[in-house]
Amino acid sequence: TRKMQVPMDADGYIPRIRFTQEPNKLAIITLNRHQNRLDMYFGDPRSTVCKQVLRDESDAYIKEIVFDNIIFYPENFSYLSEKSGYNHLYWYSMGGNLIKQVTAGNYEVKNFLGWSADDDSFYYVSNEESPLRQAVYKIDRKGKKTKLSAQEGINSAQFSTDMKYYMNRYSNLSTPTVITLNDNTGKVLSTLVTNDALKQTLAKYKVPQKEFFTFQTQDG
């Protein structure tokens, strides 16, 4: 048994420990007690020495979505951060150097789906059309963005390891979850789940139609 030399606060947390693609680099993510400062270290399991590669700070707190969207590649890793005011995707070298901010704008990236080495493209889910909707997007090395999901509502996706295909889960206020198999251009190859039986059951109960609305409070 070896104790890793992680330079963290005495009352801090280690919310995640992740394998990278290098056997001598174990990613150790720490939070301070207030959970508004995140540090990531690469620890050598043999020497137990840990090197800091990333620090992120927030005025409020670091959301759990950040930990689960760090994906390690041979030369890079992904990171979601609200340091611009909105949750966006950043691309780092394995040495901890920021290569680029992948997404930007007045919207939130909800989930990073993966990076394709074939064409240096990033796939993600965001709510850039509306806070009430989520769609699947692709953005290439030049910053050209393509919306892959056609349905309006809540979309999520799970990609194959080669990033050529994905399963899309979609639902909205009147549509139970529909699952389709798509290629990485968004083309639907097969419908796997329709939930037609559930639709028919709900129709029998004549459930009132739900709708969203906005209103203004006294303080604006």
Predicted regions and their residues:
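Non-catalytic accessory segments flanking enzyme active sites
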Residues: T1-M8, Y13-F42, C50-K63, F67-D68, ...
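Short coil/turn segments that connect the beta-strands within blades of beta-propeller domains
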Residues: E22-N24, P74-E75, D118-D120, K164
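Short loop/turn segments that connect beta-strands within beta-propeller blades
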Residues: D44-T48, S93-N97, D140-G143, D183-T185
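Cysteine-rich, disulfide-stabilized extracellular repeat modules
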Residues: V49, G85, L98, D118, ...
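Loop/turn-rich, solvent-exposed surfaces of beta-rich toroidal or solenoidal domains
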Residues: Y73-N87, S116-D118
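A structural signal for short, hydrophobic beta-strand segments that form beta-sheets
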Residues: L98, V109-G114
